[in-house]
Structure formats: C-alpha cells, structure tokens
C-alpha cells in the first residue's frame, strides 16, 4: 500500500492521498521545504525593490531558481489535491449509484448532489491554481532565457 502526503502553504495542513481508502488521513511532513522557499523568495523580491535592480544583478539567477522551485512544488501540491478531490468525487458518485431504490429519497440525493458540486468547485479552484503556477514556471523560464540572451550580446 502506497501513501503519498503533500503539504500546503501552512505547516499543519496536509493533503493526503493513499491507494487505500482507509488511509486517506495519514500525514507525513514531506514538503516542509516549501515554506522557507516562499519566505526567501518574498525577502529577495523586497530587497530587489529596496536596493534596486543593478545591485541585485548577481542575485537574479538565485531568485529565478527560487521562483521555479516554489512553483514546481506548488504545482505538485495542487496536482495532489486534484487527485484527492477526484477520488472524493468518484466516491460520491458511487454512493449515488449504490443507493437502493427505496432509499432514494430527495433529501439524501440532494445532500450528495450538494457535496458533489462543492467538490467540483474546489476542483475548479485547484485547476486554476495549477494554471497560475504553470504560468509562473513559463514566465520565469522566459525571463531567464531573455536575461541570458541579453548577457550574451
């Protein structure tokens, strides 16, 4: 049985995935390095504003590397959340299909439908975050390439 656990932006908020339904709540702090990277990136961005672009020319590659690492980890976290939400959505669909005909009263079906749509909304938010982080990855890589070409000329 394989258990994968990913950490969100907050130190005590794990997002868990497991190959077995009973182990969905397991947690291991695998991605704790995400928080220091976020802090370092924000500090460096503030320092660039404070001291100017020319003073930070040598630190730009490091800042780009931090942005890439942070975007990659956040992307991995969002993909894990997406998998978890897809699993929850499939469980709700299974519950709706498995309801015996005599138990298919309106209240139970409505409750399951509400849960399904709430999870669907969360999925849309996660997919939006995935797209945002892909954009960050691509723009950072583009900026890095432009800087390297400019330095070569």
From Swiss-Prot:
Signal peptide: none annotated. Residues 113-151 form a coiled coil. Keywords: Coiled coil. This is Putative WASP homolog-associated protein with actin, membranes and microtubules-like protein 1. The gene is WHAMMP3. The keyword Coiled coil applies. It comes from the Eukaryota.
């Amino acid at each position: 049985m394989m258990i994968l656990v990913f950490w969100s932006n907050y130190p005590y908020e794990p997002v868990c995935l497991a190959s077995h339904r009973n182990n969905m709540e397991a947690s291991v702090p695998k991605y704790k390095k995400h928080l220091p990277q976020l802090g370092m990136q924000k500090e460096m961005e503030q320092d660039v504003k404070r001291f100017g672009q020319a003073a930070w020319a040598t630190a730009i590659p490091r800042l780009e590397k931090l942005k890439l690492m942070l975007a990659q980890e956040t992307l991995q976290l969002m993909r894990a959340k997406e998998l978890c939400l897809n699993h929850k959505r499939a469980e709700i669909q299974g519950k709706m299909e498995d309801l015996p005909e005599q138990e298919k009263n309106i209240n139970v079906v409505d409750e399951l439908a509400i849960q399904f749509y709430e999870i669907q909304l969360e999925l849309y938010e996660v997919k939006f975050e995935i797209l945002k982080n892909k954009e960050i990855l691509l723009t950072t890589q583009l900026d890095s390439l432009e800087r390297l070409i400019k330095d070569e000329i």
